[in-house]
A protein has these predicted regions:
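Active-site microenvironment for binding and transforming phosphate-containing groups
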Residues: 1-253
Length: 253
């Protein structure tokens, strides 16, 4: 588990960016696979989620995960939230309720954890390229502001994800972003006639543009096997038929 230096300063919250070590799964899911949507044994995944919850002192019954759909849809979880077996469809969660853990799972996409140190509100965002393109980050931050947040009180941490050097994209991908945002050109690099995209840096840029200055980026490339993270792109390259998911969690104590 990786802890953010910035978020670790606050005793009111618990959080963690988890790698693939320390779980119960085997084979291509070895070992802390937290992807309920993967083809791994459900029993193993549920045991892995219990391990994660224990690490951040949370009841596994109080962990909320989404059926992530690469959207800009988010949910505000209030004290009346009823825990159901069926997960909500979306890609970000927000709450001000104590002891409710918000989690997102990734396998190269960018996990973002946000804390309002004044209002004691937390958010967990799954920021894949589609969600970023659909402005999920902007929508979450604007919602927080609507709830009374001031951007000077927001702490945002970008967790481990695929880095630019490993994220090759096609021309139509680049064109799509350039058409929407001319500034995105600074996040594309050409090397040996191949185009690469710095998704995590682009997320950082978006958060900064929205007025958040208290930012941290955890520079761990999920694609690089030595960093011990699950990676969708690496699994596809290795011709594996599925892949595990890394989880990132935040909770108000």
């Amino acid at each position: 588990m990786i802890k953010s230096k910035k978020l670790s300063k606050f005793q009111q919250i618990n959080h963690g960016f988890f790698d693939k070590k320390g779980g119960k799964s085997t084979g291509i899911y070895k070992s802390l696979n937290c992807g309920v949507g993967s083809s791994d044994s459900k029993k193993n995944v549920l045991n892995n989620l219990k391990i994660v919850c224990k690490k951040i002192n949370c009841s596994s019954k109080n962990l909320i995960l989404l059926n992530q759909i690469h959207s800009s849809k988010f949910y505000f979880i209030n004290k009346n939230y009823k825990f159901k077996k069926k997960k909500l469809n979306g890609d970000a969660l927000i709450t001000n309720v104590k002891k409710i853990a918000l989690g997102v799972v990734v396998a190269d996409c960018v996990p973002v954890l946000i804390y309002d140190k004044n209002l004691k509100i937390i958010s967990a965002i799954h920021a894949g390229w589609k969600g970023v393109y659909k402005e999920i980050i902007k929508k979450v931050v604007k919602f927080l502001i609507k709830k009374g947040s001031n951007t000077k009180n927001l702490v945002a941490v970008i967790g481990p994800s695929i880095s630019e050097k490993s994220y090759e994209v096609q021309k139509d991908f680049k064109d799509k972003f350039l058409k929407k945002d001319k500034q995105s050109k600074f996040f594309f690099k050409i090397r040996k006639n191949k185009t690469y995209f710095g998704l995590n840096k682009y997320v950082y840029y978006h958060l900064k543009k929205l007025g958040i200055k208290n930012l941290e980026i955890i520079k761990k490339n999920t694609f690089d096997p030595k960093n011990n993270f699950f990676s969708a792109r690496r699994s596809i390259q290795n011709k594996e038929n599925d892949y595990g998911r890394n989880i990132s969690v935040i909770m108000i104590n």
